[in-house]
Amino acid sequence: MANDIDELIGIPFPNHSSEVLCSLNEQRHDGLLCDVLLVVQEQEYRTHRSVLAACSKYFKKLFTAGTLASQPYVYEIDFVQPEALAAILEFAYTSTLTITAGNVKHILNAARMLEIQCIVNVCLEIMEPGGDGGEEDDKEDDDDDEDDDDEEDEEEEEEEEEDDDDDTEDFADQENLPDPQDISCHQSPSKTDHLTEKAYSDTPRDFPDSFQAGSPGHLGVIRDFSIESLLRENLYPKANIPDRRPSLSPFAPDFFPHLWPGDFGAFAQLPEQPMDSGPLDLVIKNRKIKEEEKEELPPPPPPPFPNDFFKDMFPDLPGGPLGPIKAENDYGAYLNFLSATHLGGLFPPWPLVEERKLKPKASQQCPICHKVIMGAGKLPRHMRTHTGEKPYMCTICEVRFTRQDKLKIHMRKHTGERPYLCIHCNAKFVHNYDLKNHMRIHTGVRPYQCEFCYKSFTRSDHLHRHIKRQSCRMARPRRGRKPAAWRAASLLFGPGGPAPDKAAFVMPPALGEVGGHLGGAAVCLPGPSPAKHFLAAPKGALSLQELERQFEETQMKLFGRAQLEAERNAGGLLAFALAENVAAARPYFPLPDPWAAGLAGLPGLAGLNHVASMSEANN
């Protein structure tokens, strides 16, 4: 009985929900199928009842209070600000809340009145005591400057070839931005939190306000509403922290390779410079370590850790043990966030080649399509292809992008900015790879070569188009006239004839087409053997009477065609004179000179001289 029932197969469509939401947003902007009109301070907002009821409990109660026929079309709301309602509507259709330090209070009040709890929680976390807006604005400006530099570097590499190192820097820079949705909430510290906070309170004053208990940067539970928070559970492997580490350090054990020397005296001789907000300060404020119970597993043999380096760098750091650090899911993301670029404010710079070697090369698997993503910061970017999230929007044409650097490049179309200038001809370009392709015109470099015909190209897409056509793999005839050696050989021998070094003549093409009507006379020409003379066979011979008859037929056809053309035109003496002139023209007879010289000395072809005299008389 169970075998008769077909097994149900569930086929998921991850992008369906986001596509439906995007379609509803387009309908809202175009005013299509909108069944409710919200009026706030003489500003009208057309929207859909179902979307509002799904996001707000207030609208759900309002729209389900009576029958649909009794509900009005226009609702006037006087308890919210227009900017706050516009931001909430944008959140309802795009799942992205755009707020500023000035309108966060208005959005909080509107979310409370409309009963949207998730927006209320986010606004309360942003307005936490100690998180003043001035400090956030300063950090936002600094981070934007860093983003501009890093995005310029990334743009140069991603269009020509995808570089995992640039993707890691881009993801880390996006994490540095003080997004209001990424600011963690304040929770009551646990017993282990007091231990770590006490340890951080004894650290040197080089890192002020970063490790003090009760500050916004104290260690607590990570809570954010970005896409990364959806991926943390059962995604990052738990990091096994060695028990031998005597002090708390945010660095992974494998951060320093085995090939590094153990003596770091050269770094310790550099003078210490005070930092207003170092990279570690920013990391610990925005990314906080949540402590859990440590799994009782035998730790692997630890690699050598340069403790002497930290002793020289932090001479005032107390050497007492601070307690074991518990492993957790978020610790892997915390370690992947660190890179040599972000630690540049703390440690002296080293060569770029070694810096690239130190960057983490983590591999993560997509939980939806199970594709292995190489690079620490590429998985959240890959997840946006499934969720359809596009958090960056153009303020002019309202086109959305998944990445901030793509939005910056798109804005150049509106501003007309062309930052890349050619030093030879002063040509300007929007993209750096366009400048590289243009520079090859001046340098003559063709780096892309076909492996079949060895033809070189200046651009990779030209090579791909050439290979796709497969024009270099197939044999094709030459265009235009054949070389002189080929024409001479074709006059002497046929396709299956002997080699060109043997003396023989073959019938020209004009004579070969009308051949096969040999009369009584035969023409014999010198050749390799008597059996291969072309007039020895009946098919290749031609009589003199047939040649004269064909010449007369050609003259009559040309004369009749000229008369028809003269009658078709607007007649007159001029048209008749032109027709007579055309009729009197001698037709071309394709008989080359070598044949005339070769046939003149033969007694059986004396009639050909009569044909030549007739053509001369016509001239």
Curated annotation (Swiss-Prot):
Q: Which Gene Ontology CC terms are recorded? A: nucleus
Domain BTB, by residue range, is: 34-101
Task: List, alphabetically, the CDD domains matched.
Answer: BTB_POZ_ZBTB7C_ZBTB36
The UniProt keyword set, sorted, is: Metal-binding, Repeat, Tumor suppressor, Zinc, Zinc-finger
Matches recorded under Pfam families: BTB (PF00651), zf-C2H2 (PF00096)
| Superkingdom classification of source | Eukaryota
Biased-composition ranges, Acidic residues, are 133-173
Q: Where are the zinc fingers (C2H2-type)?
A: 364-386, 392-414, 420-442, 448-478
Indicate yes or no for the key word Zinc-finger. yes
* Spans annotated as Disordered: 129-218
Q: Where is the composition biased (Basic and acidic residues)?
A: 191-208
Extract one GO BP annotation from the record: regulation of transcription by RNA polymerase II
Q: Name one GO molecular function term.
A: DNA-binding transcription factor activity, RNA polymerase II-specific
PROSITE patterns attached to this UniProt entry: BTB, ZINC_FINGER_C2H2_1, ZINC_FINGER_C2H2_2
Q: In which tissues is it expressed?
A: Detected in normal cervical keratinocytes, and in some cervical carcinoma cell lines.
Q: What does this protein do?
A: May be a tumor suppressor gene.
What is the protein's given name?
Zinc finger and BTB domain-containing protein 7C
- Where does this protein come from, organism-wise? Homo sapiens
This protein's gene is called: ZBTB7C
